A protein has these predicted regions:
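Structural motif
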Residues: 4, 68, 126, 164-166, ...
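Generic hydrophobic alpha-helical membrane-segment signal
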Residues: 78, 161-165, 240
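Carbohydrate-interacting regions of secretory-pathway proteins
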Residues: 1-157
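N-terminal low-complexity, Pro/Thr/Ser-rich intrinsically disordered segments
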Residues: 153-170
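Short hydrophobic/aromatic-rich motifs at helix boundaries and adjacent loops
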Residues: 103-104, 158-161, 191-193
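A metal-dependent hydrolase metal-coordination microenvironment
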Residues: 168-253
Length: 254
């Protein structure tokens, strides 16, 4: 960790935030944190900046939902190989980004680019960020097919989504249903590719796929391993009495 010239690597660490704790893990940076990328650490669901939650590749792939809670230990894996940056939280992929030949960056993010450098931990909240079990494994650059990566990269000069992320604007589709072959895995991969966050909203009510409290909880428990905002699309007039108030509160919104 001391040589400050890490380029291709796997970084793994266990983290926990106390209430109000937030910050970032930096890589390809310098001692002053003036260059490179940062991965957000923020599990405060009441934070006014709700579109930069844990796992976000800040201003490039901002995430609107953390499925990790405050006071809960979690594992973060950051892999940088060639032009690709991957972030996993508790083993689940949340970011898959390939930096193109001509990345789009605003003036404020001019130096948010791949290069090489040291790691840094930034804490800028009112609580603590606790860290343990830090490991780094260097990746042999000769094993990386950079040309193949670049062939898969987005054209950011003509990509309106990256421009919104760079402008610190939340990018979120509030109305997505899992139907017609769109599974949670397909939706999550599509979200990671495009940079658009999703709200997944099941149809709930009499005559619809989810009709009672137990089905709601089964659905939510299945979905909580993905960084989706979980809404409920209430159907019919009976939904108010079909589902208990306690169950309705389990959704992010109705």
């Amino acid at each position: 960790l001391k040589n400050g010239k890490y380029k291709n690597f796997d970084l793994t660490l266990d983290l926990r935030t106390t209430p109000g704790g937030k910050g970032a893990v930096w890589f390809h940076t310098d001692p002053n944190l003036k260059k490179g990328y940062r991965i957000a650490i923020n599990n405060d669901r009441a934070d006014k900046v709700w579109w930069k939650m844990t796992g976000s590749l800040v201003s490039v792939r901002n995430l609107t939902k953390s499925f990790v809670k405050e006071d809960q230990w979690f594992k973060m894996d950051i892999r940088v190989a060639g032009q690709e940056i991957d972030v996993n939280i508790n083993g689940e992929p949340v970011v898959e980004y390939i930096q193109p030949t001509a990345p789009y960056r605003t003036d404020a993010n001019t130096y948010a680019l791949l290069s090489e450098g040291t790691f840094g931990i930034e804490s800028d909240g009112s609580g603590e960020i606790q860290i343990k079990n830090i490991t780094v494994n260097v990746i042999d650059e000769s094993t990386i097919d950079i040309n193949a990566q670049l062939a898969e990269a987005n054209d950011e000069q003509n990509d309106e989504i990256i421009k919104l992320h760079q402008s610190d604007f939340p990018v979120l589709d509030y109305h997505v249903h899992l139907k017609g072959g769109l599974t949670k895995e397909v939706a999550a991969k599509q979200s990671r590719k495009t940079g658009i966050n999703y709200t997944i909203a099941p149809n709930c009510g009499i005559g619809f796929p989810i009709t009672n409290d137990q089905q709601v909880m089964d659905y939510l428990n299945e979905m909580r391993s993905q960084p989706f905002i979980l809404g409920m699309q209430a159907e019919g007039r009976e939904w108010i009495t079909t589902f208990s108030p306690e169950t309705l509160k389990e959704f992010d919104y109705v």
